[in-house]
Amino acid sequence: MKTAIIYWSSTGNTEAMAQAVAQGVESVGAEAVLLTPDQVDPAALGAYGAIAFGCPAMGSEVLEEMEFQPMFDGCKNNLCGKRVGLFGSYGWGDGQWMRDWENDCGNAGISLVAPGVICCDAPDDAALEACRALGKALAE
């Protein structure tokens, strides 16, 4: 199964998480394609059996608003029936942005394969393993 891993990262933390998700996808023999928001065509998402979205918490615990949020909003209608996962890092707060993002997905009829994977600042070994597990769950 071909899996898209779409992420936005300013410090490299969420990018490291995206790479770990890709490792998980590839560990079960599936194809992982890493994309940034500017590379995403919502109409082309049909080519993927599963999609992971990664975005850090920004500002007052919201998704990045200039590139990522508009791209994600444009993709929502193409995600019903897909295997979807979420991940991201944060530097303060308690992960509220991920709970809000999960609720947004639920309200849009998007079912997630697992709870969103989050970590504070740079991902440690446990966070990277959780990302690999998310990749496996998406691809299996």
Model-based region annotation:
Residues Y7-T11:
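Aromatic-flanked redox-active Cys/Sec active sites in thiol-based oxidoreductases
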Residues K2-T3, N13-A16, A20-E140:
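FMN-binding flavodoxin-like domain, especially the glycine-rich phosphate-binding loop
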